[in-house]
UniProtKB/Swiss-Prot annotation:
Family to which this protein belongs: Belongs to the trehalose phosphatase family.
Natural source organism: Arabidopsis thaliana
Pathway recorded for this protein: Glycan biosynthesis; trehalose biosynthesis
Coiled coil: none
UniProt-listed InterPro entries: HAD-like_sf, HAD-SF_hydro_IIB, HAD_sf, OTSB-like, Trehalose_PPase
A Pfam family that the UniProt record links to this protein: Trehalose_PPase
Protein name: Trehalose-phosphate phosphatase B
Signal peptide start-end: none
Catalytic activity, EC: 3.1.3.12
Function text: Removes the phosphate from trehalose 6-phosphate to produce free trehalose. Trehalose accumulation in plant may improve abiotic stress tolerance.
Requisite cofactors: a divalent metal cation
MF terms in GO: trehalose-phosphatase activity
Amino acid sequence: MTNQNVIVSDRKPILGLKTITVSVSNSPLFSNSFPTYFNFPRRKLLKLLEAADKNNLVVAPKITSMIDSMRDSSPTRLRSSSYDSVSDNDDKTSWIVRFPSALNMFDEIVNAAKGKQIVMFLDYDGTLSPIVEDPDKAFITHEMREVVKDVASNFPTAIVTGRSIEKVRSFVQVNEIYYAGSHGMDIEGPTNENSNGQSNERVLFQPAREFLPMIEKVVNILEEKTKWIPGAMVENNKFCLSVHFRRVDEKRWPALAEVVKSVLIDYPKLKLTQGRKVLEIRPTIKWDKGQALNFLLKSLGYENSDDVVPVYIGDDRTDEDAFKVLRERGQGFGILVSKVPKDTNASYSLQDPSQVNKFLERLVEWKRKTVGEE
């Protein structure tokens, strides 16, 4: 039986997926036993939080854990002592040995792909575009857009992002690729224009359609409850939502964390994850960027193929799900974009979007050269 949440434009099932079971999160973060501060007026809540900060009072453990996690998603702070600086350099050197630059190891990567089909998977924020203060201004450069077009003309290519498809497509402006938005919960194939000049999507996959009304409601609630926290921004990503705190003063993080926690208590079918300076809220279905990668490979006919080399490039915690899938498949390469050492399931690293651009350029050049030699 075809899952009712899987939609194909020609009304035919692609994969015959089984019905996806929605589970309830058991995370203690969402425990109903934890008291909410919202019995208090907002001013009183702020005074309590400010008093706790000034007097070094202990914030409730579950919120403290959440704040620590929010700090972990921040860029690594510079340390003052020369000893720590030397230690950091040693750690980075050791990390680079374990996860060498994909540029330095380029020949090793393409040698493994000889005679096989490379399939490219690309995150957006922090990978194709730089991380910026305002998420609405995370524009891709002209050079990056052109190289993505070149990559798409040589390899099956997908952008896998937490953003909505509409938002990321407006940034990228490339039709010849797959878009997997909302952490893979919204997948569309390359578009083409019909005789009337209208675009047609080949594939549309939405395993969380039933959550749309719930997501919309939570977006509205959080927009209302966070508007008094300067710098907080709620973004509707269609099948998930983001609460950005990049521009929020760190002293306000406990208040923001409490707002998010208090809202999610009433929505146990939603779970909280984190990215770089962003809280991600999404359905508790078993679906992530790794599942999206597998879905796309299966759609392309490479589910059980030994002649495919998936390459996934991303910078975020949520990309680790895709890196892990590649490890489990025993094929392909995960490339982490990061300037600082991080725990990762990737095989290689790149420092920033400019290095991603260089890697993609070299990949296109290699492909054109090998085609010319055939």
